[in-house]
Amino acid sequence: ILVLDDALQSYNVYKNISIYVYDSIQSFGNRLLVPSGPLRESVKNAIRKSQIFFLINTEVCNDLNDSHFKHILKYKIEINPEFKEKKLIAFAGLGFNKKFFDQLKSENLNLVLTKEFPDHHQYTVDDIFLLLDQANKNDAFLITTEKDHVRIPDEFKSSVGIIHGEIVSDNNLGFTTEIEKYI
């Protein structure tokens, strides 16, 4: 089994199943395609090519009626209890960094600073030195996502805390059963 992220438009890869994930926080933006908007292809085409369609962040869904969706997904983060007692500097290189930072704020963490990097950023020694300098100046601890932590130079990994996250279905059995139909 091979799972690809952002591969809906990869026509040179044979797929047994395509799963379209709609994030109601990001929405469809202005509904225009790159470079004029956030979409890589029209919503209509993406839905037509997908066997499963998921909605995440349902609490802010304004664009769509959730009756169109087979399963509802939510992204949950797991906060180390030690982080709740510390001043924190969070950094991330995600497609939508603000969502990650907002989730941390909703957990009432003491964020003294957030630092955004481009999606899939490969952290350099200089990046981490600058972050550690900010942490020292603010008497704070660095935290980031699991996705970002693996891209930190090895010698700095122990200096950065990890925020674990997972996407969970409203019905894990249903989710698994639906995917198994195509395997």
Predicted regions and their residues:
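Conserved beta-strand/loop subsegment of P-loop NTPase cores
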Residues: 18-22, 47-57, 69-76, 82-91, ...
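Redox- and metal-dependent alpha/beta enzyme cores, enriched for Fe-S-associated oxidoreductases
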Residues: 83-125
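A short, acidic, amphipathic alpha-helical segment used as a generic capping/interface helix at domain edges
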Residues: 122-138, 147-149
